[in-house]
Swiss-Prot record:
Keyword presence, Transmembrane helix: yes
Additional notes on this entry: Carbon 2 of the heme B porphyrin ring is defined according to the Fischer nomenclature.
Protein name: Protoheme IX farnesyltransferase 2
Statement: the UniProt record of this protein carries the keyword Repressor: no
GO cellular-component term (any): plasma membrane
Residues that span the membrane, as ranges: 9-29, 36-56, 83-103, 108-128, 135-155, 163-183, 209-229, 230-250, 264-284
Pathway(s) annotated for this protein in UniProt: Porphyrin-containing compound metabolism; heme O biosynthesis; heme O from protoheme: step 1/1
Cellular location(s): Cell inner membrane
C-alpha cells in the first residue's frame, strides 16, 4: 500500500471533472464578483465529498470490478487497500468535505452535497446499479449536484438558476453514460449490470441518446432566457449542443457502434467543459439580459 493507492481509489479524473462544473456554477452566481477564499473552500470541500463517494463506490463494487476490463486493476480489486481502511478513509474524506462546505460556505451547499452523496452511494451504488435499467437516471442526479453546490455556495438560494443547472447536468449525464455503456458493452454484460444497451439493446440506447441530447440542448438555453447568462454563453451552448445532437443522430447510420459511441462520449466532455467555462465568463443579472434584448 502506498500514497498512490490513496489517490487512485478516489478516482482523480472524476474529481477533476466535477471541479470544472463546480467552478461553472460558482462563477455563474458570482457575476464577476468572486470571493476566492470561498471558491477555494467550495472546490476543496466538494472534491473531498466526491472523493469520499468514489472510495465508497470502490468498496461496494469490488465484487464486480474484477469482471470488467476497465476496472480490474482498481486498488480494491488488486488488494492494494483493505476494506476496513478504505471505509475509514472514505468516512474521513466525507466528514472533512461536508464540514468545510457547511462552515466555510453555507448549510444549503452542504445539503446539496449530501443529497448527491446519498443518491450516488446509497440509491445508485448499493441498489439500482445492479438491479434496474433506471439506475443511470437516478444516478444522474448525483452527477448534476456539483454545479448546484457551486451556485448555492454563493447565492445561498435554490432558485430558478439552481433548478436549471440541476436539470441541465442531469440530462447531460444520460447520453454521456449511455455512450460509455455502448463502447464498454462487453464489460457491463460480463458484470451483469443492467444498463440500457445491455438490458434493452443498443438501438434503444441510441434513441434515448438522441432524445436526451435534444432535451439537454433546450435546457441549456434556459440560463440565458431566464436572465442568468449572456448571449455569448447562449451562442456557445447552441453551437455545441446542436453539433452534439447531429453527432448523436449519426448513430442510426453508424457502422461501428463502439467508435461512434466513443465520439459521442468525447464530445459530451467538450460540451460540458465549454458550458462550464462560459457560465463563468458570461454570467449576467436578469436586468442585464433584458436591457440587451431591449436595444
Amino acid at each position: 500500500m502506498s500514497v498512490k493507492h490513496f489517490i487512485q481509489i478516489t478516482k482523480p479524473g472524476i474529481i477533476f471533472g466535477n471541479v470544472l462544473s463546480v467552478a461553472g456554477g460558482f462563477f455563474l452566481a458570482s457575476k464577476g464578483h468572486v470571493d476566492f477564499a470561498l471558491f477555494l473552500a467550495v472546490v476543496i470541500g466538494t472534491s473531498l465529498v466526491v472523493a469520499s463517494g468514489c472510495v465508497f463506490n470502490n468498496c461496494i463494487d469490488r465484487d464486480i470490478d474484477h469482471k470488467m476490463e476497465r476496472t480490474k486493476n482498481r486498488v480494491m480489486v488488486q488488494g492494494g487497500m483493505s476494506l476496513p481502511l478504505a471505509l475509514i478513509y472514505a468516512t474521513l474524506l466525507g466528514v472533512a468535505g461536508f464540514s468545510l462546505l457547511y462552515v466555510q460556505a453555507n448549510p444549503l451547499s452542504a445539503f446539496c452535497a449530501l443529497i448527491g452523496f446519498v443518491v450516488y452511494v446509497g440509491f445508485y451504488s448499493l441498489w439500482l446499479k445492479r438491479k434496474s435499467v433506471h439506475g443511470t437516471l437516478v444516478g444522474s442526479l448525483s452527477g448534476a449536484m456539483p454545479p448546484v453546490i457551486g451556485y448555492c455556495a454563493v447565492s445561498n438560494s435554490f432558485d430558478l438558476a439552481a433548478v436549471t443547472l440541476l436539470v441541465m447536468f442531469s440530462l447531460w449525464q444520460m447520453p454521456h453514460s449511455f455512450a460509455i455503456a455502448i463502447f464498454r458493452f462487453k464489460d457491463y454484460s460480463a458484470a451483469n449490470i443492467p444498463v440500457l444497451p445491455v438490458a434493452r439493446g443498443i438501438l434503444a440506447a441510441k434513441k434515448q441518446i438522441v432524445l436526451y441530447v435534444l432535451a439537454f440542448v433546450l435546457a441549456t438555453l434556459m440560463l440565458t432566457l431566464g436572465g442568468y447568462a449572456g448571449l455569448g454563453y447562449l451562442a456557445v451552448a447552441a453551437a455545441m449542443g446542436l453539433y452534439w445532437l447531429y453527432m448523436a443522430w449519426g448513430g442510426y447510420k453508424a457502422e461501428d457502434d463502439s467508435k461512434w459511441a466513443r465520439k459521442v462520449f468525447g464530445f459530451s466532455i467538450l460540451t460540458v467543459t465549454a458550458l462550464s467555462v462560459m457560465m463563468g465568463v458570461d454570467s449576467q443579472t436578469a436586468a442585464d439580459v433584458l436591457m440587451t434584448y431591449a436595444r
